[in-house]
Structures are given as C-alpha cells and as structure tokens.
Amino acid sequence: MANNTILAMNALQSNIIREITPLSDKDCFYIAERYKTEFTYPIHNHAEFELNFTEKAAGVRRIVGDSAEVISDYDLVLITGKDLEHVWEQHDCHSKEIREITIQFSSDLFFKSFINKNQFDSIRDMLEKAQKGLCFPMSAILKIYPLLDTLASEKQGFYAVIKFLTILYELSLFNEEARTLSSSSFAKIGIHSDSRRVQKLSLIHISEPTRLRCLSY
C-alpha cells in the first residue's frame, strides 16, 4: 500500500501545472465563487496564498502535498506554501450543487512592519502553519460562514478587505484545532527556532559579534 501511494504521488508530481493566478498587483485579493457539478481543474501550485472553501462536495478527494483525504459536505483549507501542489478531485462525489469559493492573495498584503505587530500574532502563526496546508474544523467554518458567504458580493472594495481580514483573524483563533496536511519535507519547509529571542536576533543587524550570554537574558 505504501509503495502504491508513493507511485501515485510521483505520478501527480510529474503533471503539476504552475498556475498564473488572476490576482492583480493593484488588488489586495482575488475571489472567485463557482457553482459546479464536478471538479476538473488539474493539480497545480502558485506563488499566491489561497483560502479555498467547498460546500456540498462530500466525496471529493482533496490532495495537498502528500496528504490525500476524502472530504465531507464542508471543507475549508488555507495554503501558503508557494510550491505546495494541491487539487480537488471529483473522486466519489455525486453532488450536482457544489459551491466553491477561492480567495487568492499575495504575501505582500502583509508587509513585515505590519504583520509583525503584536495584534497580528495569531494571523502570523496561522500563515506560517499553513505552509503545509491547514484544514479548519467545522466550528471555524460556522464562525466565518456569514462573512465568507457574502464576501464575493461585497460592492465596496475597502469593506471587502476589512471583511477578508476579519475572516483571517477569526480563523487564526482556531490555530490549535486546525490540522496541518502535508509533511514538512514534502512542503519543503525548513525547521525554524521557536525561540522569539533567536528569531529577533536574526532580524536585527548586529554591529558586533553576538555572544552566547546575550541569549540568556
């Protein structure tokens, strides 16, 4: 069984499409709401971050990196790995009323001086965790559903951005319950230190040699 899985993953990797998304440099995000009877788009990756929601799609197989799962009626996944391939396959879904909402946004939306503020701690942690793909629990979906349900029809661009940021914040409160999908090695994620002191040292230009005693403070 393990060998079959590896062969299947290798076959998928050889067919990965590098998607050029419709996101404009002048837009904060791109959103597409689709009603469909089947999933046909092939496995792909792209540079932009993506939040993907599916409704009435029980039986669809979701593949993110080396993770493959058959989803239920509701599914919400955040992907921030720039080379992390993903696809939703029809598999065993017989629904004729599938709804899909895809939101793509650039990492540049959160410039460093902004995302590193204390108030964005939970969002920053969520975006980092989502480099391997992040699947949210039903409780999170229910929490943000009213916002997500109306985001595509929001006429005022500024309020749409505020609504989108609110969605990200509300989802970030479920960091502990959300599941990562792909393995670190497959998602090409390096091991980072959890120490905020070490992270801060890596961001600050140090004019003199750093001594070990500095880390003890």
How should these model regions be labeled?
Residues 48, 97-99, 161:
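A structure-centric signal for secondary-structure junctions around beta-strands
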Residues 204-217:
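Single conserved hydrophobic/aromatic residue that forms the stacking wall/gate
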Residues 63, 88-90, 216-217:
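Short glycine-/acidic-enriched loop or helix-start segments at secondary-structure transitions
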Residues 146-149, 199:
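Positions in alpha-helical segments
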Residues 3-12, 18-23, 80-147:
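A hydrophobic/aromatic-rich effector-binding and dimerization subdomain
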Residues 134-139, 153-203:
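Short, Lys/Arg-enriched, Trp-marked, Pro/Gly-tolerant hinge/linker segments that flank
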Residues 1-78, 83-86:
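Generic protein-terminus/edge-of-domain signal
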